Every structure is written in structure tokens, then in C-alpha cells.
């Protein structure tokens, strides 16, 4: 068959199949257009569940006469004009498909007037003909879109519409979601001539709570806890349900990304994971959350309906949401948790405490906040200021100011958000100090010590190496290996420092770094939850081995449940996250099966070998990064390197030999 270019009418109807699923889809697209036009008042009239009439009227900026015809054309929009605009979308719409798709399956009338025009103009388009007729009309500044007889020309699509009550229920839900995203906009909804919803514009905090109560119910508002969290370009605020409150169901789950209502699995997973251990069975958390992300870091252009987004750094966003929600849950249950600690000696693994800095988890500090007193509670106005799409308030942007809070439950108080503050302060001070240290500063003399390891003598070394032992000052703290000059035999680094030249074994350095990450002093590795738990089928012998060494395995941040012969890996520590976890688990159990008695040190060394540099071939850039990590995380190995880690090169005999040869040649001539 020959390939033909589709006529515009058919192309629009195909596009309508993605954009216009039901009357609620039409309402969503038209409401978003009104918000993009800057409307502060929107009136919605529905007849017969939207199948007969959908009319949306706003007081936005309007559309000029010259643009009316283009407004109904496909791929015509005023919201983006360049590729750069597409990569940083802040408007609700941007495709230019909605009006064209809607008009191809209905009888559409668009009436609009701008402030600069003395009269309004009306455009009419109907079904497959797509002929747009423009004529004068009477209308205030703003726009009105009337959609009559939806799917009148596509009987198959019309048959799929549900009952009038069901279709209006979907429209009502869309309006509720839009109303929660823009507190500053007044929205009125009428069905069959009867006013059903009236959301007045909310400027004050108590008005925000009134709208929240009207949409989510008094029960949610009474039990909800305010959440405010910020880190760099990421910010989240809103309300989450008290973990000890009775769960009503999953119908109150509203999430917005840069003001856009969203149904994203990554966000839902992060929230559910934060509530893990607080809910039972099929219970679902209730929440209303507003996530603000740098528009360059989120891709909205995923689906025509714009229900989904794609984050450029999804793991970072997931961890940020997870820690923000978990921090609030911990604050309100800290009294209960402290009692559990006294009884059990430690928190359960399901709470997943913050990981240690050396492991490098995505951790986020909350701005410091003074403890809330009874007097400040009375003055606090808290809650969400302004519309969701307009970013943070001045108070929320300033880490030095106390964030306003509101007490929704009987005992909830917002306390100092310091779960990660100390850790982040230490990290910031490390960076600041590093900037002040010269690239290759003079270092204290190295004290080479023999730790009893054997070295590989198979490689031929053409450089004469003479170990040198010099006492180092114990008071020195700024230790560095020096500068990496070259890579020798693909696994040794030739380094230069104030003490001369040295040859460093990169494989040994990598092994020591992995051991330091896996075996931190005086603490166990903290588990970091997986985005999706992994299931591994185990034999009976492997299950018995796991049960025998379960306590030791959990010390490395590995959280596993055994059920019906299958292991479910829920969390691992960050050093292990990039590994093939099912394969690593079976290898670990096979290793432990051969050891009757196995210590934590032995397991740590075994894991370090599994994590070692895969290729065994090192580049100079990799060597520089490795030594920087060793100097930062394991200064003891820099202060007193073992003989199988570093050997200083004595150049004096080589220089003497060269001078001797030159003297001989000079005598001959």
C-alpha cells in the first residue's frame, strides 16, 4: 500500500484519542488554558455530565482577533517558541493540540476579548470540516469556550462514556485537583443549572485551610501535619496525614510538580516507603504535597495528557521526598520511638535512618528552626502561602528565619529539623577547607609500616626501590599523597610529593577504601531503601545460611525478608547499591556456607573484594579520584601507609650511576 499524508481532520481526531478521553479531559485542558491566561475567576457550566455541554468562562488576558483562527489550529501556541522553552516548561499547556483536538470531536465555540480591543470576537469550528468562522460578539475581557455534543461525530467513542453521574464525578475530581493547586483562583462549578462547588479565592492562611477542608474533609485537616523542606533547587511543602490517625483510604492523594497535578509512581513510592512501618496491610497514606523542581531538571513532554513527568535525577528526587516525609513522621512519633528504644535498645530497620556521610547517600538538611513554644504556637500562621505554582515564600526561602507552623493534630509540634544538619555542616566545612588547601601542599614525612600483607612480585620493576622509614609528627592532620605523575603498568601510580617520588599500588588503595566504607568505626552501615524491592529465589541451604548470619549481614545495611523460599531485598547500604544484588547475595551466602565462624571484618573484606575495580586497568583520572577519596576518608593510610600500599623511590643511586657512566664516557673521549 502507498504511504499517504493524513489529512488534518483525521490527524486531529487521532490526536484527540490521546488528549480527549472523556469530558473530564476536556475540562482539564480548558482549565489549564484559563490558568495560563492569568485568570483569577473561572466559571464552569456542565450539562448531562459534559456530554451535552461544557462551558468554561474566565477573566484572563483573552485572545486577539488575529489569533482566534490560529488558536483552533493544531500545533499553534503562544506558550513556547524555541527548544529552550520546551526544556524549561512552566506553563500548564505547551503542545498546541488541545483546542484543535477538542474541536475535531465536538461543536466548539471560542469567544474572547483582550483589554486592548473594544469588541469581542467569536470563532466556531465543527467536527471534521475544521472550517473556522470568526464574527463579532459581546463579551467582557477574557475568554469563554463552549463544547457542545462531545463525540457526536464518533459514535464508537460516545458509547464508551459512562453514566451522567460517573462522568460528572470525574469532572468534579479534576476541578478539586485544580482548586488545590491554585488557592488564589476563584472557581465555580455548576451542573444542570445547579451550583455544586464554589471555591473562593484564598488569600489568608485560614482561607487556605477552609478550601483544604472543603476538598479533603475536616478529618484530614484535623489530623494533617504541615511539611516544609528545602534543599538547593528542590522544595516540598504541603500536608501529610498523622501516622497514628485512622486511615480513610487512598482518595486523598494529591501531588503537584511545579503547580501541575501529577500521578507519578516515583513520588507515590517515596511517600509509601516513608510510611512503611506506620501503616498496616493495604492502608494508604493521605497527603497533599507540592514539589518544586528546577524546570530544567524535569521533563513534562512525556505524554499528551501531561499526567506524567520524567525527572533527570529520579533517585535524588525520590530520596528527597522520602526523607522529607519521614522526618515529619519521626518528629510526631519521637516519644513513642524513644520508649521503643528503651525497650528494644534500637530502632527497627523499617525506619531506615539516615546514611553516613562517608557512604555518600543523598541527604538533605532542613533549615534550622528554633524550638516551638506555646507562645509562638499561638502566633504561628503556618501552612501553605500563595499558589503552588509560585514557589516558596520569603520565610521558606530563608534558612535564618523561623518557619511558621500550624498545629493540626492534638500533640503535633514542629521541632528542630536537624536530622541531617550536622552531617551537612561537616560536609560544607570539608569543601571550604579543601578550597583553601593548595593542590599539592607539602606533606609530613611518611612512616612506612609493614602490616603483614604480601605483595605481588611477578611484575618486573625496572626502578630500584628502597623503603625508607621516617618518624612522622602525630600532630599533623593535613595529609596528602601528592601529585599523580603517571600510571605504571596500568595498576601503579607514580606520585610526587615534598618527600620525593613514590609508587602506589592502586588495587590495594581501592581495597582499603572499600573496607573503610564497609567497616566504619563504632557503627553499622545504614540501609538505604531500594526504589523497587528485589526478589531472589534461595535454596533451603542458602536460607539456613542466611538465618545463621542474618545479624552480621544486617550490620552492612542489608535488609532482607524471607518468605516461601524467596528473599526480598528491601534495602542495602550505598556502597552496595551499584552491584548486581541477587548475584551478590548468592555469592555471599556461598562464601558464608564455607565458614563455620565468620567475623564482621572477614565479611567486610570479602565484600570489599567484590566491589573492587572491575577492569584492573587504571587511568590517571581514576587514580586521582581514588587518592582524593583516600585522603578525605582514610587519612590514617596517608599518615602511615603500609609497604604494600606505597614504596618511596630512592633516586640517589640512579643519579650516581648516571654520573658514573657520564664520567666513564668523558674519560674515553
Curated annotation (Swiss-Prot):
Lineage, top ranks: Bacteria, Pseudomonadati, Pseudomonadota, Gammaproteobacteria, Enterobacterales
Keywords from the UniProt entry: DNA damage, DNA repair
Assigned protein family: Belongs to the DNA mismatch repair MutL/HexB family.
The keyword Transferase is assigned to this record: no
Listed SMART domains: DNA_mis_repair, MutL_C
Region (Disordered): 361-409
Organism: Proteus mirabilis (strain HI4320)
GO BP terms: mismatch repair
UniProt-listed Gene3D superfamilies: 3.30.230.10, Histidine kinase-like ATPase, C-terminal domain, MutL, C-terminal domain, dimerisation subdomain, MutL, C-terminal domain, regulatory subdomain
Cellular component, GO, one term: mismatch repair complex
UniProt name for this protein: DNA mismatch repair protein MutL
Segments of skewed composition (Polar residues): 363-384, 393-402
Cited function: This protein is involved in the repair of mismatches in DNA. It is required for dam-dependent methyl-directed DNA mismatch repair. May act as a 'molecular matchmaker', a protein that promotes the formation of a stable complex between two or more DNA-binding proteins in an ATP-dependent manner without itself being part of a final effector complex.
